[in-house]
């Protein structure tokens, strides 16, 4: 915790990211004579591991911001911070939120979070099914006992059945929500956007409050970068993979 600017007092506390995190944070803040409304929390977006904590902090009344890890490391280098430890990162992120004033994060609607969870589960199961099918192909091409082949075939079939079950749940969920159904229909009406891409685009676009196509492109990392200076620096344009500013 950073008090009174980057030159002010610093308080640190290690808190595990689990189901009791918000309760522990609130208890510690009470000892510091602070309330959620007094605190601006910033955390790096780390896959899906930040999502529950960010949502629970938001629901508890905190102002929450998410930082792009690449951007925060650039910020750290700009401050001359080369060391990377939890304590140093916490100080760097506190400075980041104080100086950059990142926008307030709002959690996606419950129907979007549920759709995202279904899609992630489908992707995991599909990957497992493909790996099991590759093993089956290998077993069929080698001297493998029949019991092993039967086991592999059953597992591949079970995984495919579960993929189909999840896909039915996804379709039913989209159909049950007028807003999701409308947006999904619009997305899949675009040439080259099929059902799977449409579902993933639906989650990305509805999970963030983009106000322009440029913002969405920056988030997805498809913004062209040109490197040209004078007569000596002329690199081929390429796509940015950095992602959003925050």
What are the residue ranges of the model-derived segments?
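Gly/Thr-rich phosphate-binding beta-strand-loop-beta motif of the actin/hexokinase/Hsp70
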Residues: 1-5, 93, 200
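Short glycine-rich, Thr/Ser-proximal phosphate-binding strand/loop in the N-terminal lobe
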Residues: 1-21
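Short, basic/hydrophobic alpha-helical segments
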Residues: 20-38
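Short glycine-rich phosphate-binding loop at a beta-alpha junction
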Residues: 37-46
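Short, well-ordered alpha-helical microsegments
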Residues: 49-53
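Long, charge-rich intrinsically disordered scaffolds of nucleic-acid metabolism proteins
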Residues: 55-59, 65-189
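Phosphate-backbone recognition surface of nucleic-acid-processing proteins
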Residues: 195, 200-246
């Amino acid at each position: 915790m950073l008090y009174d600017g980057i030159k002010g007092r610093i308080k640190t506390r290690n808190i595990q990211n689990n189901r009791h995190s918000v309760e522990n944070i609130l208890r510690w803040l009470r000892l510091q004579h602070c309330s959620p409304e007094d605190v601006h929390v910033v955390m790096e977006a780390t896959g899906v591991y930040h999502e529950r904590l960010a949502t629970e902090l938001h629901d508890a009344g905190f102002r929450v911001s998410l930082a792009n890890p690449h951007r925060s490391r650039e910020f750290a280098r700009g401050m001359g911070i080369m060391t990377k430890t939890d304590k140093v990162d916490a100080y760097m992120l506190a400075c980041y939120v104080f100086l950059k004033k990142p926008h307030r994060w709002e959690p996606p609607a419950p129907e979007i979070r549920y759709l995202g969870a279904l899609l992630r589960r489908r992707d995991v199961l599909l990957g497992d099914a493909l790996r099991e099918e590759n093993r089956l192909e290998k077993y069929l091409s080698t001297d493998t006992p029949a019991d092993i082949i039967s086991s592999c075939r059953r597992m591949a079939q079970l995984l495919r059945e579960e993929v189909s079950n999840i896909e039915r749940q996804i379709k039913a969920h989209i159909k049950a929500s007028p807003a999701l159904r409308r947006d999904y229909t619009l997305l899949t009406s675009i040439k080259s956007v099929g059902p799977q891409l449409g579902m993933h685009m639906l989650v990305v676009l509805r999970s963030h409050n983009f106000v322009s196509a440029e913002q969405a492109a920056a988030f997805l990392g498809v913004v062209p970068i040109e490197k040209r200076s004078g007569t000596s620096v002329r690199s081929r344009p390429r796509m940015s993979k950095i992602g959003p500013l925050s």
